[in-house]
Design a protein with these regions (language model features):
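Vicinal oxygen chelate
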Residues: 1, 77-130, 161-180, 200, ...
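N-terminal beta-strand motif that seeds the catalytic metal site of vicinal oxygen chelate
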Residues: 1-18, 61-68, 112-145, 151-152, ...
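Core segments of cupin and vicinal oxygen chelate
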Residues: 2-5, 9-50, 76-83, 88-95, ...
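DNA polymerase sliding clamps and clamp-related checkpoint/processivity subunits
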Residues: 46-62, 66-70, 88-89, 112-115
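Short, flexible segments with low predicted structural confidence
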Residues: 52, 118-121, 184-185
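A structural feature that tracks compact, well-ordered secondary-structure segments
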Residues: 55-57, 67-71, 79, 147, ...
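Short, basic, helix/turn surface patches
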Residues: 58-64, 114-116, 184-189, 247-251
Length: 251
């Protein structure tokens, strides 16, 4: 069985927790739940296939951490050091493993045993239903691929270089969503280190979602054809607190 079952949460660092909580409640169409997370105040939103967690920062806003659901953290704790991944602090009994960024190409990643208590989720037809993909920007797709597929055992589904997009794209399945690695070609990033880029949210009815977000005061682009066949997308241009944000629907 795979070490990682799904993406438990995406963590977004924001300057104002109150303001960001309002914005993400409007964006996601879900209530904000205030709760403690790793000793600090956070706000959580539950979606169909993952959660969004907001935490306050004095540093740059944006996507800060991916937390993977791992059914057996004890065996992961045994296995990961053998493939070169180290932990920030492995508190026994805590069932939350933060990986040392020096061993994960600078990315802030963690594994946790999923606590499914109280994960109620319901949404209107125009609401965002879940995450479609989380995007990592990479200077070296091969090394990032080794991290995600060889070490973390995510299933690689696609490795595509398209000069029209000036990019190499690698897709890794995680539960029912995708961790996408985006490697720019013309202006490459530094090969040593990756960084989190953006989030693409899934909508069952993108025209309704687009209209709803405009009605809630978001600056949203028109719906256009997506890169993947049979998809349509629009860009959310404000109130996402440093996270490049796309909404994706299927025809």
């Amino acid at each position: 069985s795979r070490m990682i079952s799904e993406l438990d949460a995406v963590v977004i660092a924001v300057h104002s927790l109150a303001e960001a909580a309002d914005d993400y409640a409007s964006l996601l169409g879900q209530p904000a739940r205030e709760e403690e997370f790793r000793g600090i105040t956070s706000v959580r939103f539950q979606l169909a296939n993952t959660a969004v967690r907001l935490v306050e920062t004095d540093e740059r806003q944006g996507l800060k951490q991916l937390i993977f659901a791992c059914p057996d953290t004890a065996s992961a704790q045994q296995r990961l050091p053998k493939v070169g991944l180290e932990f920030v602090e492995a508190q026994s009994g805590d069932r939350f493993l933060s990986l040392q960024p020096e061993t994960t190409r600078g990315l802030n990643l963690a594994l946790t045993e999923k606590d499914t208590a109280g994960l109620d989720y319901s949404a209107s037809e125009s609401a965002i239903e879940g995450l479609d993909h989380a995007v990592i920007a990479s200077g070296d797709g091969d090394l990032t691929s080794a991290l995600l597929s060889a070490r973390l055992q995510l299933d690689m589904r696609l490795d595509l270089t398209n000069p029209d997009w000036d990019a190499r794209l690698l897709f890794f399945r995680c539960g029912d969503l995708i961790v996408e690695v985006y490697q720019p070609i013309a202006k490459p990033l530094s090969p040593e280190q990756d960084r989190f880029f953006g989030l693409s949210w899934r909508s069952a009815n993108i025209d309704a979602t687009n209209a709803e977000l405009r009605a809630r005061g978001f600056d949203v682009s028109d719906v256009r054809a997506g890169r993947r066949a049979g998809t349509r997308v629009c860009t959310v241009r404000d109130r996402t607190h440093g996270v490049p944000t796309l909404i994706l629907g299927r025809d």
